[in-house]
């Protein structure tokens, strides 16, 4: 993988994780983070530039979905779960 391509993948990975942290719901937040990490680990050894480009486009589309869902999540926030409340760690 070219250095610029690697940097682009890392930027996208960090952006996906950052946006996933915005979910107020513990369940959505942990699910999104787990799925992102699993997907990137699964595809880390791919060397085919066409396949990398295809996966990057898919990840960019997923980033847009996560951003949109994060905004909706904040508009209709619910009460925090017991495990999310201070003092319950």
Swiss-Prot record:
Q: Which InterPro entries match?
A: Complex1_LYR_dom, Complex1_LYR_LYRM4, ISC_assembly_LYR
Its protein name is LYR motif-containing protein 4
Q: Name one GO cellular component term.
A: mitochondrion
Question: In which compartments does the protein localize?
Answer: Mitochondrion; Nucleus
Q: In which pathway does it act?
A: Cofactor biosynthesis; iron-sulfur cluster biosynthesis
Which UniProt keywords are present, listed alphabetically? Coiled coil, Mitochondrion, Nucleus
Q: Could you tell me what this protein does?
A: Required for nuclear and mitochondrial iron-sulfur protein biosynthesis.
The entry sums up its family as follows:
Belongs to the complex I LYR family.
Which lineage do the record's taxonomy fields give for this organism?
Eukaryota, Metazoa, Chordata, Craniata, Vertebrata
Q: Which gene encodes it?
A: LYRM4
GO BP term (any one): iron-sulfur cluster assembly
Question: Coiled-coil stretches, from where to where?
Answer: 44-71
